[in-house]
């Protein structure tokens, strides 16, 4: 059964149209932000079959990255990338994205568009010039205009219920100057100010959308929220987002209590103090290793314990068993070729079934909300 939208927030919880707690538990399906401009896997599986597979595992949302570049491409996507979706032959990247959004929401899945990059390619690196919402090729006005177009495009689809405004805020070089991300300081790289501006513009078009605001430094730092919250004209619509990986500053032998302390300092306090929801929009690791008994080490055990203890909303990176083609943004250097194996992916290489049932079982154990309005 589809979640009753629109979604809103109630303290630290996301709630549905009836005020009942919703715990977002999803997967990232990537590729549209990369060189070809379409989600990976459409050469292997029909999009409707894939959407059915996602929903059958119990996931209730899909974070769906795109790039600004992709939205402006008017040439048809080469048929070779759409072999199992022949009805999409001759479509532009945005038309393919539209069709995938429809397939996902037809299965009752919440879709969360995410501006993953301005340019196309693989994210992320300190030197990819895509850490801010503007660079030498993309002006601020273009960023806001494209987001307004996205909001308008899906305003009639109630299951496009949230937007993730900018992936992994970080340093970028713009006009020859190295610029760092800021929060609440009223400088040109103030992400809190940008989220407020873009969120309010989007709400003029679709006031129902949740506005997801990622923390600084690769979405690892939400400490600025303590003194400067994102305040939109429409109340109860802000969700903050963190990302966490084994390399996100965690010692190899970190204790669970130390991990909890680190995560709560970085952003979990927003939950414990009842300020707003926090969504762990990306986390993942080698799926084969995590599926093995005792696999994943202390980070994986600590993360699962944290997600469970604090009843956190989350989204696994990634669904994909294979990559789309991706270069380093701003270069022609290929980092991953189309079809290269993605070790973090949940599916078999042919995209037709779950490749790591033990890992999916671990994720399923964290899907149901334990606390919140209307629970228990």
PLM region spans:
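Active-site mouth of glycoside hydrolases
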Residues: 4-227, 235, 323, 341-351, ...
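Residue-level marker of positions within ordered structural domains that often coincide
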Residues: 32, 168, 245, 312, ...
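Short, loop-centered acidic/histidine patches that primarily coordinate divalent metals
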Residues: 67, 281-284, 317-320
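Aromatic-rich peripheral "rim/lid" segments of glycoside hydrolase catalytic domains that contact
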Residues: 290-376
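Extracellular cell-wall/glycan-interacting regions and their flexible linkers
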Residues: 1-4, 16-17, 370-376
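Glycan-binding loop/region signatures in secreted carbohydrate-active enzymes
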Residues: 28-31, 38, 42, 239-241, ...
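Glycoside hydrolase catalytic-domain groove-lining segments
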Residues: 185-290, 298-312
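A short, local hydrophobic-aromatic micro-motif
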Residues: 25, 161, 279-281, 315
